[in-house]
Amino acid sequence: MSLRGLGELGLLERIRPYLGPGAGGDDAAVIHDGHRFLVASVDMFVEGVHFDFAWESPADVGWRALALALGDLAAKGARPEWALVSVAMPHGWEVDRLTGVYEGMHWLAAHFGMTIAGGDMSSTAGPAVLSLTVAGHVDHRPLARADIKPGWTVGVTGPLGAAAVALRERKAWRLLPLIEEGVRLNRLGLACGDISDGLVREMEKFSAMSEVGCILEAASVPRAQGAELEEALTSGEEAELVCIGPDEAIREAGLEVVGRTTEEAEVIVVGSELETTGYDHFA
C-alpha cells in the first residue's frame, strides 16, 4: 500500500500505536513540566511544496515558516519563548539566500520577544527543507480537539482566504500569528485550532479526534478581500483561528459564528459544493 490516497488522518491512525498516551490528536504537544504546561510543535517546509523562491524573497520564506509554526502555539494560548531551526539545503544555494531566510525568522521572533535558540544544518540533493520546533508555556491545560462536545458553536476570529488570494496573485504573504488573541480565547475555555490546511479540513481534524461532527454555514464564513467562497472555506496558511465552545462563550469572545457541532461524526458544508475540503499532503 502506498501513502497516496490514505490521507494525513489515515496515516496518523497507522502510527498512533507507536506514540505516547494522548499524542497525535493535536498539532501541538502539551506536556506538564511539574509547574506549568509546555506547549511544543514542529513543522516542516519543503521547497516546491510550501514555498517558492521564484516569487518569494528568502526573508519572506523565513518569516512565513516561523509564522505558520507559531500558529500551533496561538491555538493553544501559549506565548512563544524559543525556536529550533534545522535547514537542509542544496550546495548551489547562495549564502545570501540562507542568511535571508534567517533574517525573516529573526524579524518575526523579535516581534514576539522569542529566541532562535539553535538547530542543525545539512546538505541535500533534493529541494530545500526547513524544520522548525517552537515552544512556549501556559498555566492551564488547553482544550484538545478530542474535548469538543455536540451542540457547541463554531466561530472564527476574522475573514478567511487571504492566503489563497496571495498565492493566486503570487504575492508575498507575511501573516502575523494571533498569539495574544489565542491567549484570550483559551482563557475563555474555547478549543481552538489554527487554519493551516483550511477551515473545513481543520474541522475534519476536530471531528476525527472527538467523534463529533459539524455543520458549517458557507454563507456565514467571512471572506478576505478578493477571496472566493471556496477559498475562504479551504485556504490554508491563514492567520485566523477557528474556535469551538458553548454558544455563550463564542459570542462573549466576539467571534464570527460559522456553524455548530453535531452528534454525527461528519463535517457538512451547507451552501457550497466543494471540490476539495483543504490541503492534504497524502490525499
Regions found by a protein language model. Name each.
Residues M1-S57, K76, V85, G100-A109, ...:
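Extreme N-terminal cap/leader segments of soluble proteins
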Residues L3, G7, L175, E252-A283:
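Acidic, Ser/Thr/Pro-rich beta/coil linker or hinge segments at domain junctions
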Residues V30, A69, G77, I116, ...:
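Residue-level signal for inorganic ion chemistry
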Residues H35-L38, F45, R79-A164:
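Glycine-rich anion-binding loops of enzyme active sites
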Residues M44, V85-A88, D120-S122, P159-L160, ...:
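Short, ordered loop/turn segments at secondary-structure junctions
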Residues P58-W82, E103-H111, P177-E180, R184-R187, ...:
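Small-aliphatic-rich amphipathic alpha-helix that forms the alpha element of a beta-alpha
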Residues G92, W173-E238:
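Active-site-proximal betaalpha loop/short-helix elements
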Residues A135-H137, V242-P246:
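Short hydrophobic/aromatic beta-strand micro-patches
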